[in-house]
């Protein structure tokens, strides 16, 4: 495969969800390619059938499409180096492993699970790190052939050099070296004939012409083994970009198993996809130069400015408050029509009576940080909640339950006027304001009680006249009359 352009790949395992760290890897991989007019490849690594979850491939497709991380080659659209599903590439891996055996760079290992367990138990008892002891590393060729002919189970192991060092250069962490003596003879082909994750990764990356490998820093320790495989085959080694972990706090990694949010969870809570992607990009990466102080970036912006030298070595702490702030900014930037379209499903889940959604959204949008918190603000529309008349007391508005009764009685004829257009919020407000002036009172003295009478709450998405126009004349008059009756005791 010619390497005349940058080729990156996102290679997830279909385990059922897209956690934040995975999505960040996908994003950085996409940006690395697109910033350089390169090719972004999607490869599904489904060889670990024990972790495979039905429908998980669709989760991967849907997440990448929703976030705009569209691939140039992949399982559904094909490409010049397919197939792009690892389980469909099984035939080739064993051939490559056997090539290494023939060249003396790998070997058949016949050690049983029982022997390995006993070996590791003994090593642990002596305070040693568990490792393979090379028992089958130098078996005579005749013995190997005899045991293979007898059908004895085996794995194929890489023959790691016992001396020297293996080093590599990472675009984030710099030059790293490991003593070969510290590395185990890793398994390439398992007893069932399936390749190990590491081996399949190297072979597939080579055959697909991958020039830049972007992954989590947990793979730093495996990279020397990857490089020894590239060297054994005489293949070009890709550029490595290892990203710092995403942490829940200083001690704990973000983990779905610990109940931490996946991408789907965040969307289900009402975070906007664009905001999630923006925030995730900033987890361990910082813009440079004129963009250093900027926090809001569209995907198109990121394609223009993203470079790997902005990636930090330090772990990134997932900050829910920062995500909220970025999400709130994205909500504020929506047009009224866009906000209504996004908020409407949440409104409909909470309100089943006719209301003026356009006016409701005009009041919600400046205050809303997360769409999922909209329903709890609307629980009074369908049915008036129980409330205590002490709510009418407000020092700032200079109201008491007694003055509230007076205010509502004064408002009743205003709101009952058939000529008053409840579809025009300003008209209703002006009529109420005129009544306040007539009484020699401030607007709040009249309108604060109206808000309580219509909602039974101090905090609502809009003031009294807003709520009246959202609910309409009939509901407004019913609730004002009920409030007067309640205040009469």
What annotation goes with each model-predicted range?
Residues 18-20, 266-274, 313-319, 352-360, ...:
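Structural motif
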Residues 34-46, 199-212, 233-247, 460-466, ...:
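Glycine-rich phosphate/pyrophosphate-binding loops
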